Amino acid sequence: MSIIDHHSVVPRSEAAVGEDGRARTYEVRTFGCQMNVHDSERLSGSLEAAGYVPANGEEADIVVINTCAVRENADNKLYGNLGHLASVKRRHAGMQIAVGGCLAQKDKNVILEKAPWVDVVFGTHNMGALPRLLERARHNDAAEIEILEALETFPSTLPTKRDSSFSGWVSISVGCNNTCTFCIVPALRGKEKDRRPGDILAEVQALVDEGAVEVTLLGQNVNSYGVEFGDRQAFSKLLRAAGQIEGLERIRFTSPHPAAFTEDVIDAMAETPNVMPQLHMPLQSGSDRILRSMRRSYRSEKFLGILDRVRAKLPGAAISTDIIVGFPGETEEDFLDTLRVVEAARFASAFTFQYSIRPGTPAATMAGQVPKEVVQERYDRLIALQERISLEENEKLIGRDVELLVATGEGRKDADTRRLSGRARDSRLVHFELPAGSEVPRPGDVALVRVTQAAPHYLIADAAGGPLRVRRTRAGDAWDRAEAESCAAPSLSGGRAAAAVGRVSLGLPTLRTREPLTSPGVGTMPLYDPTDGQR
């Protein structure tokens, strides 16, 4: 992995060196959405630019928790982690704990009241201040709190340590201008701020120059991009411009808002070959009455119409969604409307949430809060329906050849099986068998496989005779370089798999050979942690 240094310079910090003269180590723990994942890359980049080094599995001198504030269990996760870290800190001389992100922006001093052993609290608008705050807290031997109410510097100007050598996130905007009654994000991340197209494309080009072949464009509402500079077609133009970057094979984006999803975006998706046939489109509810109560400025008929137009121009596109069950005032009739829309939409996957009261949102004080047992029963019915649909949609792919970008960190790992994993063009997760005598693909290489089995959350491609078809890529070369730089054992790229069934130790995910296909697995498009994330 590499640090891509953008415009901002993070000075070296004296606090990054311990009393023994060694560089102090850090660990970043991330809760929540894909925005937080990308923010954590910036936090890591800023810390390393200041002189800190990764803990790499050891007990870290600095623990940074990047928080989410969307659901109640996000609070529970934070304070559970902090409770555990209290005892660790007592025996670890000089250890520092920092809490940032949305929950820090919301709770501010409350975090220190509940966990006085925390050293630094910072918000969503000043991530670049972390090294300075750690140094000040260490020097003064007192906690530092710095929460800004508005964005001063666009975070993409910060040094960034990418989690992947072959795929990267690129923020096109931060904040949100919508006023959904269940969502606290606009209050914590502010109004929408758009980056200029030239800055975005320069960052994409820099990623490609580093070896990346896949980029995901990020925003709370990507298709409202351009609102700040008055161009309603700015997002479709951005997709087309990114599509012209040589060497960029896959472009994804998340998340759009149905109310602002226009025909020019659909045309750009269909006419730009490296924009992937995948769409994550949050539904939230299939009831028009509930959508009004949520302040979602579309109705179910419009939503389904968008899906029809997307599929007309991108046949076979995989569409995923978010759905909230048990929103205040939801009746059985409202819920049946949601089931009806889900059946009609034929989502490849859905991230489903039981409504969680978030103080500070209009929905928190609405009448008609649905009893927990009713929410659970409806939630179970929705899950059962979507599992059936996901399986039926995946079964349609059996016998088809799919092109995979070989990945790391996908699915379960088991050193005794020969299955590796990758993402199809439509982002479906595919676990594939490595035939005897085949070239071993590296993360970032492309493999062509034939689907042999289907489950609701993934596909299986067992060997069908003959060697695996692999296309070596610049991204695979970049992965090799990153492995060499980290002093890891050289990969088996270019070699041959042993003829006998044995172990493949590549740091790649695998599945148990005899695992039942009906068992729960990784979501088809895991853009965030569905237990505490948001779109």
From Swiss-Prot:
Domain Radical SAM core residues, every copy: 162-392
Organism, as annotated: Leifsonia xyli subsp. xyli (strain CTCB07)
PANTHER family for the chain: CDK5 REGULATORY SUBUNIT-ASSOCIATED PROTEIN 1 (PTHR43020), MITOCHONDRIAL TRNA METHYLTHIOTRANSFERASE CDK5RAP1 (PTHR43020:SF2)
Broad class of enzyme this protein falls into: transferase
Catalysed reactions, semicolon-separated: N(6)-dimethylallyladenosine(37) in tRNA + (sulfur carrier)-SH + AH2 + 2 S-adenosyl-L-methionine = 2-methylsulfanyl-N(6)-dimethylallyladenosine(37) in tRNA + (sulfur carrier)-H + 5'-deoxyadenosine + L-methionine + A + S-adenosyl-L-homocysteine + 2 H(+)
Disordered, as annotated region: 512-535
GO cellular component, one term: cytosol
Positions with a binding annotation for [4Fe-4S] cluster 2: 176, 180, 183
UniProt protein name: tRNA-2-methylthio-N(6)-dimethylallyladenosine synthase
